[in-house]
Amino acid sequence: MNNHATVQSSAPVSAAPLLQVSGALIAIIALILAAAWLVKRLGFAPKRTGVNGLKISASASLGARERVVVVDVEDARLVLGVTAGQINLLHKLPPSAPTEEIPQTDFQSVMKNLLKRSGRS
């Protein structure tokens, strides 16, 4: 009688499915990041609104941690010097004249303009 059992080793698992899934995941993440950048770049992202009537209307960087900021308050516009340690009032301006509401553009017209600029229309 033959009491010897033969052990068969299975074929090594290939890395192709792992690479395929990893590639698809990286492509999806890149697509999400590109869409977020495009939304921010084209202005579809909601505008940041200030709290309690404060709105930053302009900002300029002067150094690594220094900025000059123009803040609209209810009855004045303040020019502030902002550093890492403190905020100083540089100048007080009269309130700005009310501006006309900028009409919201729809997605279709933005895409048409974008395609016209790239020459694909």
From Swiss-Prot:
Heme listed as a keyword: no
Q: Which UniProt keywords apply?
A: Bacterial flagellum, Cell membrane, Chemotaxis, Flagellar rotation, Membrane, Transmembrane, Transmembrane helix
Any Pfam family: FliO
Q: Which terms in the GO cellular component ontology are assigned?
A: bacterial-type flagellum; bacterial-type flagellum secretion apparatus; plasma membrane; type III protein secretion system complex
Q: Name one GO biological process term.
A: protein secretion by the type III secretion system
Give all cystine bridges in this chain. Answer: none
Record keywords: Membrane included? yes
InterPro entries cross-referenced by the UniProt entry: Flagellar_biosynth_FliO, FliO/MopB
Classify the protein's membrane topology as the record does: Single-pass membrane protein
Subcellular localization is given as:
Cell membrane; Bacterial flagellum basal body
Membrane-crossing segments per the record: 19-39
Q: Which family does it belong to?
A: Belongs to the FliO/MopB family.
State the name under which the record lists this protein.
Answer: Flagellar protein FliO
Species source reads: Escherichia coli (strain K12)
What taxonomic lineage is listed for the species of origin? Answer: Bacteria, Pseudomonadati, Pseudomonadota, Gammaproteobacteria, Enterobacterales
Gene for this protein?
A: fliO
